[in-house]
Curated annotation (Swiss-Prot):
A Pfam cross-reference name: Phospholip_A2_1
Disulfide bonds: C38-C98, C54-C144, C56-C72, C71-C125, C78-C118, C87-C111, C105-C116
CDD domains, alphabetized: PLA2c
Protein name: Basic phospholipase A2 PC1
Record's keyword terms, sorted: Calcium, Disulfide bond, Hydrolase, Lipid degradation, Lipid metabolism, Metal-binding, Neurotoxin, Presynaptic neurotoxin, Secreted, Signal, Toxin
Predominant cellular place of this UniProt entry's protein: secreted
Keyword Electron transport included in the entry's annotation: no
GO biological process terms on file: arachidonate secretion; lipid catabolic process; phospholipid metabolic process
Length: 155
């Protein structure tokens, strides 16, 4: 085999090894979870926020059901602003320090700092908002409709 062929083969193998290490779960969500735990000092598991109200979790619609759900809508809106700036919030990895009572975002590029700020603001909002067990795993088709959609259904 020629040396050039060996180099190409080596490059392909290295590329495949690197691709196999990529997680299919957005890594930023792991950091967001760690930030939530830092702020709430482990008092509530992160998964409690994944299916809460109309906005905590994937997507969101309608009117937030309470203050905690408004935190999630604000977080979604913040990620929307990050996307408008050309950032990919679910893939943006950032550094933060978990100082008691005052977690701080670390240095990084514009997107990393912006996304960290979104996550930090949401984590702080979660910590100060009451958690209503009745708003966990609600029927979003019934409780999270927009007013226009609800009016069309009643006509």
């Amino acid at each position: 085999m020629y040396p050039a062929h060996l180099l190409v083969l080596l490059a392909v193998c290295v590329s495949l090894l690197g691709a196999s290490a990529i997680s299919n779960r957005p890594r930023n969500l792991v950091q967001f979870s760690e930030l939530i735990q830092c702020v709430n000092k482990g008092k509530r598991a992160t998964y409690h926020y994944m299916d809460y109200g109309c906005y905590c979790g994937k997507g969101g619609s309608g009117t937030p059901v309470d203050a905690l759900d408004r935190c999630c809508k604000t977080h979604d809106d913040c990620y929307g602003q990050a996307e408008k700036k050309g950032c990919f919030p679910l893939l943006s990895l950032y550094n933060f320090a978990c100082f008691p009572g005052a977690p701080q975002c670390g240095k990084g590029n514009t997107c990393q700092r912006f996304v960290c700020a979104c996550d930090l603001k949401a984590a702080l909002c979660f910590a100060k908002s009451p958690y209503n067990n009745n708003n966990y795993n609600i029927d979003i088709k019934k409780k999270c409709q927009t007013l226009i959609y609800m009016r069309l259904q009643t006509q």
